[in-house]
Structures are given as C-alpha cells and as structure tokens.
Amino acid sequence: MRLKAINQQNNSSNGNFKSARRFLGLGSAIKLYNPQNTTDAIYATTIHELAHAAHWRMIVKEPGTNRYRDYHDAEDKMVESWATGVQWYLTRMVYSKYRGRPQGTPNYTNVVIDLVDSQIDDWQNNGKTYAQGDKVEGYTMSQIESALIGCDTWNKWRDNIKRKYNNNTKQYVDEL
C-alpha cells in the first residue's frame, strides 16, 4: 500500500483513499494533507484512510461481493462510520488521550465506538456529550468488520451485526 504525503494545506480534507489511483500498483491510493496538523491528528487520518483501503480490499477478496455496490456506491454513512471507528480504536492504542475526530457531518458517526464501548466508559464516549447513554456494548472490532461484508447501507450492516452475533445488548442496536 502506497501512501503519499502532500505538503500542502487542504481545507476540505486531511486525506483520502481512491482505489483507482492504485492502477498497476504505480499510484498511491491514499493521499494525506495538512502537514501542519499535530502528530496524533496525522496518525489518526492515516489510520482512517487505511481503514478505507482495508474495507475495499476485504470486499475485493470476498467471493460474492461487489466492489462497486458494496464500497464505491455504498452509503457514505456506513463507509465513513466504519473508518471513523477504526480511527478511534487504533489511534487510542498509540495516543491514549485521543478522543476522535470532530463530528463534522452526519456521515462520520460514532456508531462503531458505541458498539464497542461499555456504559461505564460512555461518559467519555469519544469526548462527545451528544452520544452518551447508549445501551450497546461489547461487540468486537472483528465482529463489526466482518458484518460489513455484503453490505452497502448502514441498515444492512446493522442488521448483519444483530443477526450474526449474540450480544446481551443487541436489542438496543437500532437506537444507535
């Protein structure tokens, strides 16, 4: 996987993933911008874009999936929420005080965080007050990731999570 750091400010994006830029393995599918950002923000953006790349690769390798339907044409809320959750989960392993990206648009949700964290941890739920009090907890990142296969909308992903995994809080997943 090639990453390309662009030494310029970009007010609309800290980075992006485009699978088509990997044509013949020559290009960089991931571009990162805004070198003036803090190291934890650059790290988090890198993780976010790598999560997109891993999601796309998982779909390409899985028999019966459709890379256009299940990734390129998929609902932004699902694709971005997955990457946002991976970003939060992995960045906190290196930067323990990392609280996640600001909630900029409705497509970048904290649903993955809510699926993973416990109600005890919820008070610091990504440092945000709007999502406190959810009753869902205990799903693993592996479960959430594997539930993405064959999904192109949040509703399908949510239903896959509930159908595939036994969890004492799954009756509350619809509230997220």
Which residues fall in each region the model found?
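Active-site recognition of the HExxH zinc-binding catalytic motif
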Residues: 44-61, 80-84, 88
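Pan-zinc metallopeptidase signature
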Residues: 100-176
